[in-house]
């Protein structure tokens, strides 16, 4: 039995709360059980310098954790002078995931930055950030369309993410911290609403894993993503 008493294919309770940041063009507070991530989308009326004059825009992301998002306080990375390798990896992952479903030509020469701030961490912060960031991006684009900045919503599809793992020899969905810290294998899947893969990360932690186990985790992830995409649709309806 899992520490949370959930079935192998069961998500934690997930909620989306939109428009939680007064000044951001789009915002969403997403909760995966006890993991809470605030995602805000900010519009800049110019693209990155290296993109200027090319007639298209850009979507990027930044990721951070509040010092007391975890059991013990973590120093703010701003005090060390640069983000950690983990932080850089995660924010690049979030940006890639969102660009995979965005028509950058449809943005025009503009940039949207998604800030994902972890308020409370209990495993799966990067996957929660991606799933909530899509809602914040959607609402930013909707804000732009309402003001005739863009004509059409330049989103090709939904995108969401979920963690899986092998725990006590069993493939399971949506690991919390207690499960993740003891899992033999840890994996993250980013999948579009139409079922295409954006990114797969899988790492043997305590023991190697088989192709059969990877396939089982992918099947669990697909089921979880289907549920999350339906929740996204309901949230922005």
Swiss-Prot record:
The keyword Lipoprotein does not apply. Its EC number is 2.7.7.56. One of its GO terms (molecular function) is tRNA nucleotidyltransferase activity. It catalyses: tRNA(n+1) + phosphate = tRNA(n) + a ribonucleoside 5'-diphosphate. It holds the Pfam family RNase_PH. InterPro entries: ExoRNase_PH_dom1 (IPR001247), ExoRNase_PH_dom2 (IPR015847), ExoRNase_PH_dom2_sf (IPR036345), PNPase/RNase_PH_dom_sf (IPR027408), Ribosomal_Su5_D2-typ_SF (IPR020568), RNase_PH (IPR050080), RNase_PH_bac-type (IPR002381), RNase_PH_CS (IPR018336). Keywords: Nucleotidyltransferase, RNA-binding, rRNA processing, Transferase, tRNA processing, tRNA-binding. Belongs to the RNase PH family. This is Ribonuclease PH.
């Amino acid at each position: 039995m899992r520490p949370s008493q959930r079935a192998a294919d069961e998500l934690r309770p997930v909620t989306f709360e939109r428009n939680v940041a007064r000044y951001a063009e789009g915002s969403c507070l997403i909760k995966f059980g006890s993991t809470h991530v605030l995602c805000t989308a900010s519009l800049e009326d110019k693209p990155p310098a290296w993109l200027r004059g090319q007639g298209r825009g850009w979507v990027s992301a930044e990721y951070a954790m509040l010092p007391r998002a975890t059991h013990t306080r973590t120093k703010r990375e701003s005090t060390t002078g640069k983000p950690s390798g983990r932080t850089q990896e995660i924010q690049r992952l979030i940006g890639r995931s969102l660009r995979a479903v965005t028509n950058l030509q449809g943005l025009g020469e503009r940039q949207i930055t998604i800030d994902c701030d972890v308020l409370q961490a209990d495993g799966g912060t990067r996957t929660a950030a991606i799933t909530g960031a899509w809602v914040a991006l959607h609402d930013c684009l909707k804000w732009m369309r309402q003001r005739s900045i863009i004509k059409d919503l330049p989103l090709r599809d939904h995108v969401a993410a979920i963690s899986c793992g092998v725990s006590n020899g069993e493939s399971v969905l949506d690991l919390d911290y207690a499960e993740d810290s003891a899992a033999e294998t840890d994996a993250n899947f980013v999948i579009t609403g139409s079922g295409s893969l954006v990114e797969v990360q899988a790492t043997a932690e305590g023991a190697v894993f088989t192709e059969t186990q990877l396939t089982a985790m992918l099947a669990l992830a697909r089921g979880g993503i289907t549920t999350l995409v339906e929740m996204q649709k309901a949230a922005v309806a």
